[in-house]
């Protein structure tokens, strides 16, 4: 089970939002590269970056911070990034800069042809981000709820060749209410590619529950507010996941 620390970038700083609201941002660090180093030193095997300004603007907005993070840890672990990725040129620029994966969210829902082209051009580097509330997909930094069913879109995007899916339950993100395990497993069972859970991770109990369903195709979880607020000790959580995985592998 991959525990993936999130570094959400707003105006060059590492922040956390409450339910996607840019006006409810808590600043956790003014040095995102140092934050990246901290998580890697604590045992992170992948990092999840979000360009929040980019997500709302529709184009990259935190390039300096992203490049600083890649300079710091990009040679050591894979780094994935979402937010504001709306063109093949942007994807190419990011991959050339050292990102391992780019996450396409809103653009995938609004312009499936773009996602298909991206998967063809950059095979193995494209992750799709599906944000949903009550099974329906949301777009535009969560501000618009669509009529699309998550599972229908996920299956379509799997056919395009996406590497994996980051699934966020937006009713829970930043609220420390626990991961929506049932919805995540249901999605993972419906597709043959890995699903990364996101939104609401709060404690070791969530880690236990996620490890139990790893065989269903849930390969990782994004760690956000809980590791910044201190509600979850990241290093302890990663150790716990490794121990549980070892036990499951031995079973």
From Swiss-Prot:
Active-site residues (renumbered): 8, 131
Keyword tags: Amino-acid biosynthesis, Cytoplasm, Histidine biosynthesis, Isomerase
Entry's Gene Ontology BP terms: L-histidine biosynthetic process; L-tryptophan biosynthetic process
GO cellular component, one term: cytoplasm
Catalysed conversion reaction: 1-(5-phospho-beta-D-ribosyl)-5-[(5-phospho-beta-D-ribosylamino)methylideneamino]imidazole-4-carboxamide = 5-[(5-phospho-1-deoxy-D-ribulos-1-ylimino)methylamino]-1-(5-phospho-beta-D-ribosyl)imidazole-4-carboxamide
Localization: Cytoplasm
Family matches, as InterPro entries: Aldolase_TIM, His_biosynth, HisA_bact_arch, Isoase_HisA-like, Isoase_HisA-like_bact, RibuloseP-bd_barrel
GO MF term set: 1-(5-phosphoribosyl)-5-[(5-phosphoribosylamino)methylideneamino]imidazole-4-carboxamide isomerase activity
Recorded metabolic or biological pathway in which this protein acts: Amino-acid biosynthesis; L-histidine biosynthesis; L-histidine from 5-phospho-alpha-D-ribose 1-diphosphate: step 4/9
SUPFAM superfamilies cross-referenced by the UniProt entry: Ribulose-phoshate binding barrel
Signal sequence, renumbered to the chain: none
EC number(s) from the headed UniProt entry: 5.3.1.16
A Pfam family of this chain: His_biosynth
Annotated family: Belongs to the HisA/HisF family.
Classification via NCBIfam families: 1-(5-phosphoribosyl)-5-[(5-phosphoribosylamino)methylideneamino]imidazole-4-carboxamide isomerase (TIGR00007), PRK13585.1 (NF010112)
HAMAP family reported in the protein's UniProt record: HisA (MF_01014)
The protein, known as: 1-(5-phosphoribosyl)-5-[(5-phosphoribosylamino)methylideneamino] imidazole-4-carboxamide isomerase
């Amino acid at each position: 089970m991959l525990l993936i620390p999130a570094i959400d970038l707003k105006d060059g700083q590492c922040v956390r939002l409450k339910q996607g609201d840019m006006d409810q941002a808590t600043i956790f660090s003014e040095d995102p590269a140092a934050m990246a180093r901290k998580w890697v030193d604590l045992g992170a095997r992948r990092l999840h970056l979000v360009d929040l300004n980019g997500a709302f603007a529709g184009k990259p907005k935190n390039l300096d911070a992203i490049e600083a993070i890649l300079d710091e840890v990009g040679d050591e672990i894979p780094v994935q990034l979402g937010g504001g990725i709306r063109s093949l040129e942007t994807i190419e620029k990011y991959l050339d800069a050292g990102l391992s994966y780019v996450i396409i969210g809103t653009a995938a829902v609004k312009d499936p042809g773009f996602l298909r082209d991206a998967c063809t051009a950059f095979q193995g580097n494209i992750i799709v981000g599906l944000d949903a509330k009550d099974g329906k997909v949301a777009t535009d930094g969560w501000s618009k709820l669509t009529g699309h069913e998550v599972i229908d879109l996920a299956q379509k995007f799997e056919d395009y060749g996406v590497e994996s899916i980051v699934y966020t339950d937006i009713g829970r993100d930043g609220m420390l209410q626990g991961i929506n395990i049932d919805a995540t497993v249901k999605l993972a069972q419906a597709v043959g590619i890995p699903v990364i859970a996101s939104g609401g991770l709060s404690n070791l109990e969530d880690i236990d529950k996620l490890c139990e369903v790893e065989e269903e195709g849930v390969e990782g979880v994004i760690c956000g507010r809980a590791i910044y607020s201190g509600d979850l000790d990241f290093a302890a959580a990663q150790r716990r996941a490794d121990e549980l995985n070892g036990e499951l592998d031995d079973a």
